[in-house]
């Protein structure tokens, strides 16, 4: 799943500076069109990630042999975490490029507490290693919840 995230990082990197340029030119239509295009591209992730999950046990055997057993449940949560991070990056990059940082700054102060609390709670409930990934997903509430709302507001107000 790291390969998928790495490729996505290469694809998403130009968005931030391109949005900054679009904002300076008052070209909010371009931002809206880019958002739609990135969401369409993200659909490939939604299709590709489950395929990678289905192939993961086979790839693990080739990669590390039988030395370490990686549970499919752990792979599922790694996949889910990466999907959330990639989805979030679309909206966060747009907001960063537009210079809209207040909500992100506040949520970045709250997020570590949410992460630690949820991770600890899930761990004592017996979730094991996946508790870290689940906590990471929940603590990323800015990226998958607040940032999309802010992007919609940004595009509606212009």
Task: Identify the residue ranges that each predicted region occupies.
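Membrane-interface helix-loop junctions in multi-pass transport and translocation proteins
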Residues: 56, 99-102, 112-145, 149-152, ...
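Residue-level recognition of transmembrane alpha-helices
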Residues: 42, 78, 82, 108-109, ...
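Interfacial transmembrane-helix starts/ends
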Residues: 27-43, 51-55, 72-75
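Helix-loop junctions and terminal segments of transmembrane helices
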Residues: 5-25, 96-97
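Interfacial segments at transmembrane-helix termini and the short loops linking adjacent helices
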Residues: 28, 55-83, 130
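Alpha-helical transmembrane segments of polytopic membrane transporters and translocases
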Residues: 1-8, 141
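Membrane-interface junctions at transmembrane-helix termini in multi-pass inner-membrane proteins
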Residues: 80-110
């Amino acid at each position: 799943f790291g390969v998928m995230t790495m490729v996505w990082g290469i694809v998403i990197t130009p968005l931030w500076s391109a949005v900054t340029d679009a904002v300076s030119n008052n070209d909010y239509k371009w931002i809206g069109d880019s958002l739609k295009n990135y969401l369409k591209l993200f659909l490939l992730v939604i299709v590709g990630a489950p395929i990678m999950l289905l192939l993961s046990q086979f790839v693990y055997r080739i990669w590390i042999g039988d030395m370490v057993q990686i549970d499919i449940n752990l792979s599922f949560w790694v996949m889910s975490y990466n999907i959330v991070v990639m989805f979030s990056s679309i909206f966060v990059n747009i907001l960063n490029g537009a210079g809209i940082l207040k909500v992100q700054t506040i949520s970045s102060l709250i997020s570590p507490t949410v992460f630690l609390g949820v991770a600890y709670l899930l761990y004592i409930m017996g979730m094991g290693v996946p508790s870290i990934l689940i906590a990471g997903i929940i603590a990323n509430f800015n990226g998958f919840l607040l940032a999309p709302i802010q992007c919609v507001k940004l595009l509606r107000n212009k």
